[in-house]
């Protein structure tokens, strides 16, 4: 009550921010007559004038009124479009490191030209981030004439572009691209073997369109560049045959693992657990299939990989549904983005889940992958000096933007008042009753000539509604992941009188629905339209437009509530743009996933008390409130998951930054010999310490062991025993110095043969390759640590602190291994002539190019980990402590990855 009173007196924080910015808008408006008087050349010259002022020390912020006035005037001349005052406000919000919430149809694309131009003046580059390639290309081409008129260059960053084209795109003043491509380029740059292979500049200013979709919905999705691990497709097929014999428990009891069924499903956490009965049955079936020996347990250490296969297969069957989570097309399993309803070609689930789904669907099983480099969007976008974003729906997530990205959310007012009617939800007992009610509503609306957009949350649901509409004889268009090729055409004409369009999640569609349809699309369909034809098309459109306005504008039907209120608001936001009339209503049933998991008992009880008859709906503020609370619960849970993921990923992020900084410094220098010499001293000191403890008696020395180690690991034949026999007075310090001097001498002889320049080149290559190889193994080890760290909670230890402590110890061990591996490799290398070295370098470059083209894999799960090659090998056979480590380091297992197990 008190807060409401204070807000009334002083205004909200949002009001105060806008009040401050409106003063600048008045200044910009006052400059308009002055700008109109300038010739085109004088207006263009303003860009160079601004750049010169910045170079002299003037701040970018001080240029806002003039720069925005210049862009507005240029837009009038190039596009015939003048920025509204609210768009100027939006531009200032975006320059202010904030999230601008601007409603659909308020011209976010044109608004973005203001801060993009302003921040590009410094010459450091601006990255405009969109959710898909189509929008990146469309926005870049639409805005290119304006930016080029003002003397700014525009680049487009698309997947599959060759490195020179990417470098050119990044060198432009303003670059358009997708969040995925910016992230993957960052990872690829940090896998480059020469400075020339890198494409990105320093990350300066990112302007993110549909910011909620990228920074929140996809925050749990790490970007991963992966390489193939070993083939285990047969095992997936064998385990897949067993799963249909298992029965799901009717009442879920994931805490005690007791019950009548063989496995329980936790739909909230998206996890599957075997019950005790299920474990007994699956062990029997595995023995029958000859996969496991009689008397063995599925939980024994030797069967860890088998347990991994069983869990993946169970999840594939119990949690992942065809035409909801994925589609099968041309013999391939393609993931469907749960937030946008789009297919994600080339993306694969990790942890063997994708292979398990392929086995379930009977398509070809592709190899598992091993992580080579990864980063989450949360950490990638925090690398920018300055970050801002815009969306139609951000206010519900304002707390998350503030706490994770330190971005305030500012709601920008609409240019015209919003007059859409949002009708209360209708709740039915069953799915069938709900669908029938939707069909009746559509019949009624279309009879009056009102266009209807039906939003569904999955392909499966959109096809159910489509079948019912076909039965009822209602013409309609379906827009989902299966038919996305003609997406823009369908959306453009969704405002036609009496048009019915069914669409899976409308988030990120990026195309406005014009009432009466799009006359521009009709003109574009003609080969060479005449002035008369265009005039006739416009006149016909005006008649249709007026008819739709009279019928009440676009009507939105939601077939069920989404987990997030924000995505419901996005669907509603397709109607009522720019002050147009419109309406919306959600139809729900007690069988909907959200209602079943979160709101069922309370609302079901309420409906029973009211004595509901079949086909009757409940429409009450209490129900709407209960549903909103259920959505808040889910949002809160998802926020906690993202926050926790970030806390864990921050540990890896600190290590990633340290490694990438070191790697970039290494790339930028041509001579690393000082580093090599320093490392050599450390490595030989530690090696000798292991056999000749410092300040120890000679009786404690293990000279044969030291000689063998020097021979095996450094290819050095040193008669240390002979030296000691011939020179009894040889003490420890002198002996150490002699061993180091001998090793340097042998190395220098190699350098004389191959030449100093070639040796420097080779040293740098060895350091980079060794660093990459160890970092790859470290990522796999971190994944395994992350998977099991929660169990430390049972020992009354804080899993996060344990994870930090152990991952730091692993990181320190990796750096020690790096020193050792580099010196060992350089010592053991066989000297070749320069021509041979060049040929080897050529081969390495080809391999690096192949690696860069490798499949890019994305996790879908909250904290899913990657099944790495090393684990696959160690899981299948017992490795002796003194055997060579399977990672290929050349060290004994106990001295390498045996320490981790």
From Swiss-Prot:
Induction / repression: Repressed under conditions of excess protein secretion capacity and derepressed when protein secretion becomes limiting. This is regulated by SecM.
Subcellular localization(s) per the UniProt record: Cell inner membrane; Cytoplasm
Residues that coordinate or bind ATP: 87, 105-109, 512
Enzyme class: translocase
Catalytic reactions of this protein: ATP + H2O + cellular proteinSide 1 = ADP + phosphate + cellular proteinSide 2
Molecular-function GO terms, alphabetical: ATP binding; metal ion binding; protein-exporting ATPase activity
Keyword line: ATP-binding, Cell inner membrane, Cell membrane, Cytoplasm, Membrane, Metal-binding, Nucleotide-binding, Protein transport, Translocase, Translocation, Transport, Zinc
Annotated residues for binding of Zn(2+): 885, 887, 896-897
Organism listed in the record: Salmonella enteritidis PT4 (strain P125109)
Cofactor note (record): May bind 1 zinc ion per subunit.
Cofactor dependence: Zn(2+)
Protein name, entry field: Protein translocase subunit SecA
Entry's Gene Ontology cellular component terms: cell envelope Sec protein transport complex; cytosol; plasma membrane
Encoding gene, per UniProt annotation: secA
Membrane topology category: Peripheral membrane protein
Family: Belongs to the SecA family.
